[in-house]
């Protein structure tokens, strides 16, 4: 999110009649604190965002993000916990909290879901076959992850270790 900050600040300066909004799903310094195995939420109240940015060599990203949060017309975030992170690390609570999540009807129901799942599986196997230069069977187990790649914060380390454990399990037949 911090990457949009310069644009938002520029628009605010160059075209002040255009309203600016900045939404963060997590602060860059918060991600860095957690990614460096420091306890983010246990000690959130004790962290100084500017000091942590210096310690973790994140001054540029943090500075842009902090200035953007303070100077856009509307600063938003996606949860109460992220708002607490913004208050502590950016010295600015969100103007509005836009709750994260999906509507109940986001996932299709019944035969619509089954059809979409089958088509998606066929496409994934097709891509895998082309990438690997092989012909994987229809019963191939497909395991995947999506989203932002953050080795610790998003649990990629746990995901890979779990796959390794499954791979070594002699009781599994797939």
For each predicted feature, which ranges?
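Catalytic cores of nucleotide-sugar-dependent glycosyltransferases that transfer UDP/GDP/TDP-activated
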Residues: 1-174
